[in-house]
Amino acid sequence: MKIPSHRQLAIQYNVNRVTIIKSIELLEAEGFIYTKVGSGTYVNDYLNEAHITNKWSEMMLWSSQQRSQYTVQLINKIETDDSYIHISKGELGISLMPHIQLKKAMSNTASHIEDLSFGYNNGYGYIKLRDIIVERMSKQGINVGRENVMITSGALHAIQLLSIGFLGQDAIIISNTPSYIHSTNVFEQLNFRHIDVPYNQINEIDTIIDRFINFKNKAIYIEPRFNNPTGRSLTNEQKKNIITYSERHNIPIIEDDIFRDIFFSDPTPSIKTYDKLGKVIHISSFSKTIAPAIRIGWIVASEKIIEQLADVRMQIDYGSSILSQMVVYEMLKNKSYDKHLVKLRYVLKDKRDFMLNILNNLFKDIAHWEVPSGGYFVWLVFKIDIDIKYLFYELLSKEKILINPGYIYGSKEKSIRLSFAFESNENIKHALYKIYTYVKKV
């Protein structure tokens, strides 16, 4: 917007022209107006609200981080609304979280908090927590040292760090599908090329790798146990085969093992257990066993990789919360975490069986599923032709039931991720009956 001339302003406000000139010089110095030689003086556009909004929208289009799928955005918005039934939610219900153990661990942490430095932490994480993770990994057949462990703010944060600090731009990621990683844009932000391998065809990895043999920058991403969303696990033979592929083609493996501690029968070894050449980068987390808000996970890798990631980390966020790390350490040290796990496995197995019983009664003629031996999820695949997107919106808008449709995980099947971990048995039963009713209508 152009402002009037000095003479017009002096007449309008009944002041001397010198006053107008000084005022304009001051406003120009502050950036509120600007002068075009031979044209006049103008108000800066950034004071215009519509211009600001349009400019921000334009700048967001330049972002290297893509927006989530619309369905995922909607799920993320509603997931914290307690008025909905969250039959697909990927976290523990409040009653399953170790409240008493957490309180005790926090109290123990607080008792020596004056000895704690509240300065910036290093990129590696709390030494005592790293050491106790090393001990626990050793009991699983993974022999590493403190220098091989880095604490992160959860598993997804670990994957983000690896994407930035290890893989680099334009990498090829060979990953199992369906996978929760498809509901994020963690690999897409650096223009990674995503090659999907169906979880039930994991032995096809070798053939797929051969197609990209000339591409140097590539990695395998795999969830070996209780895959999110299907609940499936690899056999020990499949794990060994993946290691063989990795060694043959000199390709690193990113092993996302966040459900490792939630097993309902004898635990199986991780892929890292078979790793003799340091090809496997192992990721895990306490978010699925303690609480998401604790935001503590870890990476196990070669010393050189950990050193590189720690340096990148210091450029981004200076490390995870030292208080959260100390609380988790206290739970591990006093064994309350392991006692909690025993109870958690028992309760989750019971809730899984409750859900499976209802599925057998209602869905056996119209859908199929597998029995997970751990984790949170049952993968419901419909035998009939049904519009899953329509079902999602109908249940959301009319019944306040939130489901996670399979397509957000890269599945082409007519599928839903069901969770027995978050809701009460009463709500699980109610939600499944409503889903059945709407499916029959469709």
Swiss-Prot record:
Reported cofactor(s): pyridoxal 5'-phosphate
InterPro entries hit by this protein: Aminotransferase_I/II_large (IPR004839), Class-I_PLP-dep_aminotransf (IPR050859), PyrdxlP-dep_Trfase (IPR015424), PyrdxlP-dep_Trfase_major (IPR015421), PyrdxlP-dep_Trfase_small (IPR015422), Tscrpt_reg_HTH_GntR (IPR000524), WH-like_DNA-bd_sf (IPR036388), WH_DNA-bd_sf (IPR036390)
DNA-binding region: 6-25
Domain HTH gntR-type residue range list: 2-46
Induction description: Down-regulated by MgrA.
N6-(pyridoxal phosphate)lysine found at: K288
UniProt keywords, alphabetically: Activator, Aminotransferase, DNA-binding, Pyridoxal phosphate, Repressor, Transcription, Transcription regulation, Transferase
Pfam families for the chain: Aminotran_1_2, GntR
Swiss-Prot/TrEMBL GO biological process terms: alpha-amino acid metabolic process; biosynthetic process
Entry GO MF terms: DNA binding; DNA-binding transcription factor activity; pyridoxal phosphate binding; transaminase activity
Recorded family membership: In the C-terminal section; belongs to the class-I pyridoxal-phosphate-dependent aminotransferase family.
Described purpose of this protein according to its UniProt entry: Positively regulates the expression of the NorB efflux pump and negatively regulates the expression of the AbcA efflux pump. Binds specifically to the promoters of norA, norB and norC and abcA genes. Overexpression of norG leads to an increase in the level of resistance to quinolones, associated with a threefold increase in norB transcripts. Disruption of norG leads to an increase in the level of resistance to methicillin, cefotaxime, penicillin G, and nafcillin, associated with a threefold increase in abcA transcripts. Could also have an aminotransferase activity.
Name of the protein described by the UniProt record: HTH-type transcriptional regulator NorG
Gene behind this protein: norG
